[in-house]
Structure formats: structure tokens, C-alpha cells
Design a protein with these regions (language model features):
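Terminal substrate-recognition subdomain of acyl/acetyltransferases
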Residues: 1-35, 145-198
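A conserved beta-strand-loop-helix scaffold within acyl/acetyltransferase catalytic domains
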Residues: 1-118
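Aromatic (often tryptophan-rich) hydrophobic motifs at membrane interfaces
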Residues: 70-74, 78-178
Length: 198
């Protein structure tokens, strides 16, 4: 352990989920935008935007990290744990978001949208819809962990409540963290095993 706490946000069903005024304004802006959101299977298109848009802004999203993300997406899809939300305007693809559904928890994984869509409030709308669906199903919505203050504020704008876990202590890690480590280890063991059999 390195002694650092990591904060993540989640919303529990039945606890009076509330968003703030900024979220309300962004949802109204989105409603006027003409952008439509729906479920989809546009994995490659979303990953392409992550590569071109996010990798410029996030130093840790190097080629190795992007390949790991792609492998994780494949593993989640094969296990029918992946949910994808996409955004389009006049049939033009604007981006999408990946979520993990496991038991009674929906976990935000990663998203990427073109800049004009983000300015129209698409991310607020996508997250709001997913949170609302989670609450209706009596599921926990988990935003995941981030050390980035603006990400934490965005999650809190949408009603996320801070939770703390100790970063490298397995027993106190949030459920999504344990699951991703398990899937990653399982996926790579299978890959190595199949390569050795060739």
C-alpha cells in the first residue's frame, strides 16, 4: 500500500438521488440540441474517438493502456456484462460510453464524445439516463474512481456521493476494481493458454 486514499462516487437506490442546478441546465441544453442517445454496439467507433480525442488529453492513455482497454471491452462483451450508449445527430456518430453491469451494480467504465456534442450536454444526458435506469431497477450506480478534481465534481453534480477506499488494499477496494482485475487476469490467462497450444 502507498498510503493514499482514492475517492470514488456512487448513488444508492432509495437514498433520495438529487442532481444540482448545473445538471438541470445541461439537460435542458441537451434537449434543445437535436442529438439522440440510444443503446448500440459501436465499440470500434467509440474506441476510435478515445484514441484520437482522449489520448491527446490524458497522458496515461498510451498505446499499452488503450490495448488493455480494448481487451477488457472484448472480455466484458463476451461475458454479456457490457452496456453501450451512443449519441448521434442526423445519423452522424458523435461518440458513446461503456458501462459494466454486474449483479445489482452498474459501473461507468469509459466514454468519448466529439467536442461539439460535449458542449451540448451529451455526457450529462447519457449519465442521467443510466443513473435513472439504475435507480428504477434498484441498482447501485458506480461512477468509478478518479483523482481528477473536475471528474469528481462532474460526478457530484449528477448526485454521486463520495466513498473512500484504500487504493492498494484488496479487501477495501470497490467491487468494480476487484471485478476488472479478475476479468483482466482471466482474459490474459486464456490468451496465454491458447497461444501455448498453437
Amino acid at each position: 500500500s502507498d498510503g493514499k486514499d482514492l475517492i470514488y462516487q456512487e448513488i444508492l437506490p432509495g437514498k433520495g438521488w438529487k442532481t444540482n442546478e448545473l445538471t438541470g441546465r445541461m439537460l435542458k441544453k441537451f434537449a434543445r440540441s437535436g442529438i439522440q442517445i440510444s443503446t448500440g454496439e459501436n465499440t470500434d467507433q467509440i474506441l476510435s474517438i478515445i484514441r484520437t480525442e482522449l489520448s491527446k488529453k490524458v497522458v496515461s492513455l498510451d498505446e499499452k493502456a488503450l490495448n488493455r482497454l480494448e481487451n477488457l471491452i472484448v472480455a466484458l462483451s463476451e461475458r454479456e456484462m457490457l452496456q453501450i450508449t451512443i449519441a448521434k445527430e442526423d445519423n452522424v456518430f458523435l461518440g458513446g460510453a461503456f458501462f459494466i453491469h454486474f449483479g445489482e451494480r452498474l459501473i461507468y467504465l469509459k466514454s468519448a464524445f466529439l467536442e461539439e456534442a460535449k458542449k451540448s450536454g451529451v455526457m450529462y444526458s447519457v449519465m442521467f439516463d443510466k443513473i435513472n435506469a439504475s435507480m428504477e431497477r434498484n441498482n447501485i450506480f458506480d461512477f468509478g474512481g478518479s483523482r481528477v478534481p473536475t471528474v469528481r465534481q462532474f460526478n457530484r453534480n449528477l448526485g454521486g456521493l463520495d466513498q473512500t477506499y484504500y487504493q492498494f488494499t484488496w479487501d477495501n477496494s470497490p467491487f468494480w476494481f476487484k471485478m476488472i482485475v479478475f476479468l483482466r487476469n482471466t482474459f490474459f490467462r486464456q490468451k496465454i493458454s491458447s497461444i501455448q497450444k498453437m
